[in-house]
Swiss-Prot record:
One of its GO terms (cellular component) is extracellular region. Expressed in the ejaculatory ducts of mature males. Not detected in the ejaculatory ducts of immature males. Not detected in hepatopancreas, female reproductive tract, eyes, exoskeleton, subcuticular epithelia, heart, gills, stomach, muscle and hemocytes. Pfam families: Anti-LPS-SCYG. Its main location: secreted. This is Scygonadin. Coiled coil: none annotated. It comes from Scylla serrata. Has antibacterial activity against the Gram-positive bacterium M.luteus with an IC(90) of 125ug/ml. Has weak antibacterial activity against the Gram-negative bacterium A.hydrophila. The lineage of its organism: Eukaryota, Metazoa, Ecdysozoa, Arthropoda, Crustacea. It is found in: Secreted. Keywords: Antibiotic, Antimicrobial, Secreted, Signal. GO terms for biological process: defense response to Gram-negative bacterium; defense response to Gram-positive bacterium. Residues 1-24 form the signal peptide. The keyword Iron does not apply. InterPro entries: Anti-LPS_factor/Scygonadin, Anti-LPS_factor/Scygonadin_sf.
């Protein structure tokens, strides 16, 4: 009887530890279209620059000789201790940009550079 109780408690504790990151990932996935849209909007504004969570970022794309666009997003002043560069590639420039933004945000999230609450506040203030 004791071993089954101990096993049950172990499972509950493990679920408590494992579930939150998954939920955070799901929350970020739900917010991702809004994040990408906001940053794409900033990219399209002349002389506006790109600011994500209060950090100045660079989002750029280049057309390659093979007809594909490659895009990169970085926020050097924010991630200088652990450089993060989001990368995207597509035949469509907008899709390459979206890919680089998504890749950057997911990587920054993996390195715990922000919380979901911070992203929600940033979206609400935008």
């Amino acid at each position: 009887m004791r071993s089954s109780l101990l096993l049950g408690l172990t499972v509950v504790v493990l679920l408590g530890v494992i579930v939150p990151p998954c939920m955070a990932g799901q929350a970020l996935n739900k917010l991702m279209p809004k994040i990408v849209s906001a940053i794409i909007y900033m990219v399209g504004q002349p002389n506006a620059g790109v600011t994500f969570l209060g950090h100045q970022c660079l989002v750029e794309s280049t057309r390659q000789p093979d007809g594909f666009y490659t895009a990169k997003m970085s926020c050097a002043s924010w991630t200088h201790d652990n450089p993060i560069v989001g990368e995207g590639r597509s035949r469509v420039e907008l899709e390459a940009l979206k890919g680089s933004i998504t890749n950057f945000v997911q990587t920054a999230s993996n390195y715990k550079k922000f919380t979901i609450d911070e992203v929600e506040d940033w979206i609400a203030s935008y």
